[in-house]
Amino acid sequence: MKTTPNEKLLKKALHSCNNKKYADKILHQEKEIFDLKQLLQISKSLNSVLEFDRLIEAILYIVMAQLKTLGAAIFTKKSFDDNLFVLNRDHYGFDIIRDAQYSINVDHPLINFLDKSDSGCTPDEISKNIKTDKIVKDLFSLSPSFFVPLKAKNRMIGFLLLGEKMESSHQFTDYEKNIIENIASLAAIAINNSQLLEMTTTDIMTHLKLKHYFFTLLMEHLYTINSSGEKKETLSILMIDIDFFKNINDTYGHAAGDIVLEEVAKIIKSCTRNADTAARYGGEEFIVMLNNTSASAAMAVAERIRKSVEEKSIMYDGKKINVTISIGVSSYNFDLESAKSIVERADKALYESKQNGRNRVTLSKNNLPKA
């Protein structure tokens, strides 16, 4: 039977349509393969970063790049036993209102609602399901487009806020929501691992790093400096000891001594940067690594800590306790010095501070200007 011209056109149209469907299917599968490869790279990238602040920053950049949003922010607990999810100081694309409350209790209805969701929800979906109290309104004031729960081991460890999408459509497709869920899952596992590391490397009383972890970080930094081949970056060490600490324990009791340790640790933390590392060295001794800090700058930091402790009145059981500290300072001299050596020099300088009357800062002789 002869094929009519109309039938030929119809067959051609069907063939063209089938080709387009086939091409669209191939494109979609190629995109899925590409996205899976991206998720693998994201997993490798996040699992290679254990330091919490750097990890949060990495997650935010990844989220904004992969999901094409104009903003991203993360709410996490400050510690495992905390009852609040707090907005991390690193966030992008959101206008922060000074008087707004950017923290939320773990028992809040919003948290319970997010916990039941896997791929997240929009502000409209939240408004329809829970009462929008002041806390929720403060979060909505940031104009987020999407809330994403962060879950690790069936436990919610925080949530992610996404800003506006770069593209014209403000709604995430089901496919995009699946990508969001996968990225959130990887981010949650990385955050959980980072928090576990924080727990195992942090002194419970002072919330400073433990001695063994401090030395690990110090050796890593020295290796980085020596590997660069350029003498552009250095570091300095502070060894700090509370003067007459035994007398405090004998006079006021060990509970008072613990309070003194906590307060001195807080001062050390407040006088140093996030890039620096403070640790409890043992007993009433502390150690600080000041990154990219010269000997003269380290002396200024040490003096600031010493003066702050001297001026602080620590209250215990209605009594004021005034303490002083002695500090030794050493700075790396680019001579392939070991971690042990630079710490020993700071310790010797601390001993000199003790011998010369306490409540003072002494620089290691190796770092003194040559005559």
Swiss-Prot record:
Its cofactor is Mg(2+); Mn(2+). GO terms for molecular function: diguanylate cyclase activity; GTP binding; metal ion binding. Keywords: Allosteric enzyme, Cytoplasm, GTP-binding, Magnesium, Manganese, Metal-binding, Nucleotide-binding, Transferase. Pfam families: GGDEF. It comes from the Bacteria. One of its GO terms (biological process) is cell adhesion involved in single-species biofilm formation. It is found in: Cytoplasm. Shows higher activity with Mn(2+) than Mg(2+). Disulfide bonds: none annotated. The active site is at residue 284. Its main location: cytoplasm. Its EC number is 2.7.7.65. It catalyses: 2 GTP = 3',3'-c-di-GMP + 2 diphosphate. Residues 233-366 form the GGDEF domain. Exists as a homodimer and as larger aggregates. Both dimers and aggregates possess DGC activity. PANTHER family: DIGUANYLATE CYCLASE DGCM-RELATED, REGULATORY COMPONENTS OF SENSORY TRANSDUCTION SYSTEM. Catalyzes the conversion of GTP to cyclic-di-GMP (c-di-GMP). Shows activity under aerobic and anaerobic reaction conditions. This is Diguanylate cyclase A. The lineage of its organism: Bacteria, Pseudomonadati, Spirochaetota, Spirochaetia, Spirochaetales. The gene is dgcA.
